[in-house]
């Protein structure tokens, strides 16, 4: 299982946002939507062995489960509609018990620390950061949990949590990449057994 945890610092925590302004009034929700599509879509299929956790304002986590996912299309607007639907049902989520809001999409009342603690029990936590060790020097883990930030750097408290809980801190190359592009490169790294098998 491959997992991606993406922190959305400015992401909305209520469903009152316009699908027509994802890059503005919706707090750069467009970045998170592109991360979701990069994590799941192949040319003519969906990666079923992937799980994505979107941290919305350190208040809610929306999880996409590849094996159960339905109604996901490769455009930002339809992905944002799934997130908005999840937020519409946020009152149904009790504590850390998720509410399934559509097939393969659920919401929990949990921020970054709670989500990180949960995924760390089941996988190898890998922080993606431009100042990390080159990924080519790291053996591909069998159950990686890649943690990355949106268009902002990790906040100090997030960086401290990752310093304590991450098994690896890696860089995907000499240049800083967009979050969604980083997911594509991470997939390629795993698909090719560390860029060894094509």
Swiss-Prot record:
Keyword Cytoplasm applies: yes
GO biological process terms held by the UniProt record: tRNA methylation
Chief location of this protein within or outside the cell: cytoplasm
Record keyword Methyltransferase present: yes
InterPro entries: Alpha/beta_knot_MTases, TrmY, tRNA_m1G_MTases_N
Pfam families linked to this entry: Methyltrn_RNA_2
Subunit organization: Homodimer.
PANTHER family: TRNA (PSEUDOURIDINE(54)-N(1))-METHYLTRANSFERASE
Cited NCBIfam families: PRK02135.1 (NF002560)
Name of protein: tRNA (pseudouridine(54)-N(1))-methyltransferase
Protein source organism: Haloarcula marismortui (strain ATCC 43049 / DSM 3752 / JCM 8966 / VKM B-1809) (Halobacterium marismortui)
